[in-house]
């Protein structure tokens, strides 16, 4: 009988199938719309009416049987494929794991933290303040006259007539003196802003400024502090010299140079004795208190420490550069 022949052929072929492609070909050949089992139903029209029910039932039973065997074979092949995949993904727990890439400290941050550690070890407190300042804190209280070029819009970033991005961290010293009674010894690290951009200047850079107020302080105390800083930052061979200069908030004022082997004398910061007018602006009696102040650009110190010639390298986000320090 034709039904038995199709059944035998289907079971025999199904038993030999070993992959998904062969299984799909089998499905089309026997279970598809034009497959052999569907073709058996076309014989109904050639049978006597009384035989058709039994024949149709037999064909449907065959389809159900082959579909069941087909599904079992599909699951069998699926299990084999999953097992093969697991074998390929087998983990050798004895193999050393891949090292995770960790972040790297920016050279400016490293130098700023080193500066802070040096001055903290010398008894200075670290104090921070707002980056948006009033003109009074940024200029007036620091004895900066109206005609001074630093107050010009071409040099500073003004937000309103009375507010600007601070041009130095000295306003932190003003705020601290208004809040505390002397003696005080502080450093104020942070970002500052000026309208300048070239190989040695950035519109946003970092400063650390220091202030020490006590009775009977002199230039000798200032020089000792800066010599100690230079020695710890640049090594035992570092020497310091003071050159006369002018800053509105100190009198006398100095440019400070450091001598480094292989480089000679290099300017690193500005300093001086606090001007009596600054003390008067914060309510300190200049007849009783004296003080010295200093300020340095962190990028400048980093350039000297690491031999960097272009300050713009610090903001170019070149991983090769950043990971070198």
From Swiss-Prot:
Reactions catalysed according to its record: tRNA(Phe) + L-phenylalanine + ATP = L-phenylalanyl-tRNA(Phe) + AMP + diphosphate + H(+)
Cofactor binding, note field: Binds 2 magnesium ions per tetramer.
GO molecular function, one term: tRNA binding
CDD domains, per the entry: PheRS_alpha_core
Enzyme Commission numbers on file: 6.1.1.20
SUPFAM superfamilies: Class II aaRS and biotin synthetases (SSF55681), tRNA-binding arm (SSF46589)
Keywords for the protein's UniProt record, in alphabetical order: Aminoacyl-tRNA synthetase, ATP-binding, Cytoplasm, Ligase, Magnesium, Metal-binding, Nucleotide-binding, Protein biosynthesis
Pfam families referenced in this protein's UniProt entry, alphabetically: Phe_tRNA-synt_N, tRNA-synt_2d
One of the GO biological process terms: phenylalanyl-tRNA aminoacylation
Residue sites binding Mg(2+) per the record: 251
Top enzyme class: ligase
GO cellular component terms, semicolon-separated: cytoplasm
NCBIfam families named among the record's database cross-references: pheS (TIGR00468)
Assembly with partners or alone: Tetramer of two alpha and two beta subunits.
The family this protein is said to belong to: Belongs to the class-II aminoacyl-tRNA synthetase family. Phe-tRNA synthetase alpha subunit type 1 subfamily.
Protein name, UniProt field: Phenylalanine--tRNA ligase alpha subunit
Gene name of the record: pheS
